[in-house]
Amino acid sequence: MRTHYADKVDSSLIDQTITLCGWVHRRRDHGGLIFIDLRDREGLVQVVCNPTESTVFKVAESLRNEYVIKVTGKVHKRPEGTVNPHIPSGEVEIAASDITLLNKSKPLPFNIDEYQEVSEEVRLKFRYLDLRRPEVAQRLKMRSYIIREIRRFLDERGFLDIETPMLTKSTPEGARDYLVPSRTHPGQFFALPQSPQIFKEILMVAGFDRYYQIVRCFRDEDLRADRQPEFTQLDLEMSFVEEKDIQQLMETMIRHLFSTFLNVPLPDPFPRITYDEAIKTYGTDRPDLRNPLTLVDVTDLMKSVEFKVFKEPANNPHGRIAVLRLPKGAELSRKAIDDYTQFVGIYGAKGLAYIKVENIDNGTGGLHSPILKFLPENVIAEILKRTQAQSGDILFFGADKAKIVNESLGALRDRLCADLNLYEGQWKPVWVVDFPMFDREDVGDWQALHHPFTALQETDPEKVIANPGDVLSRAYDMVLNGSEIGGGSIRINDIGMQYAVLKVLGISKEMAEAQFGHLLMALQFGSPPLGGIAFGLDRLVAIMTGASSIRDVIAFPKTQTAQCPLTNAPAQVETLQLETLGLKVSKHRK
């Protein structure tokens, strides 16, 4: 039906007759002429309808926004002063010789150009209209281009695109599984995969050496601000590799994507920091290195002070006291400090002590703080020295369990940087390495910080069982601007070590056989050294396109309550369907 897309219409086509198809983006009457902005997937073209073409003009008069049309006409240069430099077709217009109305549109629930005033739920309910907005469509096109380039990159390096099952077995991977009842095996269930982890390891045992997949994953977890119950991963695995092999390849890929699509050079190599360094310095294992603010530990200085708020956590083996220095922050108002105090309370902090450094040369006389009277002068002097405080700064203190201090001051660090626009540079990638293998609260069972198939730096299973808290893993996360975009590890390929890890996690040999027997069996038939990584593709595309949420780069996302306003899913099903599956709904949970 068409000869061209909008982005191909330019001055090279002047005096040629072409045909376009699309939607009426806007219709304007000016001095006897009707102008139509025709929109297709690739952009906008201005169409001019002259009353001398009576049939065309009559159709043009009847057109409304979002009507579907086909236009044939000759390409002309726009009159002087009417060029639009913001679109590829901005130097030309189409003098319509024929317009065909292909379909009408009902009155719109919202104007395509006025989406800012429309709630997200309404936009998702009418997602097919929301997707007509050029900026939304552009993000989905960019997603397609990025995926295509990723495939090309990996194909050229010997990776095989292999699909793994969508209907698999429920295993304890952290979040709840989405379960699928089996009609042919009453009382039994499939699970939708949280990741292809076990299958990709088995593919390495099978000898495929280099695997990748753009794969959908599912997690029935309590949704946080920017999570989806179904999401897309770039998943890959390699045999006969060490950490550096995977990291170097993935750095090359990410550098290539940023160079190709954003014309942005990323560092070579990416910097590396340990998990311990990240937590102590930034309060998080996903540090935004554009942010110059850092945490400084002063726990040792507070062990002998009389101030209980500091002394108790300083003498608690699970406690921490840290200081966050904000340069030129002494000008913050009391209200601003109160707001930040309330903010850190979200993360469990009981307060936010502070010292304003008004004049560093006047000693304690140049400081202002409600806590000064509780601290010896030598301690205050050492705090100022460690934090490299200057006149005009403010020092914020966190004192509690280390987890609370890290999370609250880490979040405050991010908040201050955003509020005051302290960012240095645009893109700061980093590898976080040397994660603990296991983690737990003060008391309680050990949990795998990543997953139970992660290889360990310790090679003796007995030492792992004896001192799990001392063991580091061979895991690595790629972090970009404070977002984890990829995470992976070298995997365990020794059955004895795998049983040791499962034992630490409280999983008996019998339970392990029941849950992971297929993997444990495979490990006994010549498993090569192997490792891999998975990238959150939604997050990566959102970062690269500047989207504020991953929902903006997913064609049909769920809401924050895991619902689809477009289809009204999830929904009830017929009783007969439940009976066929041997299911019965006992009650509705609110």
Curated annotation (Swiss-Prot):
It catalyses: tRNA(Asx) + L-aspartate + ATP = L-aspartyl-tRNA(Asx) + AMP + diphosphate. It holds the Pfam family tRNA-synt_2. GO terms for biological process: aspartyl-tRNA aminoacylation. ATP binds at residues 219-221, 228, 484, 536-539. Residues 197-200 are annotated as: Aspartate. PANTHER family: ASPARTATE--TRNA LIGASE, MITOCHONDRIAL, ASPARTYL/LYSYL-TRNA SYNTHETASE. This is Aspartate--tRNA(Asp/Asn) ligase. It comes from Coxiella burnetii (strain RSA 493 / Nine Mile phase I).
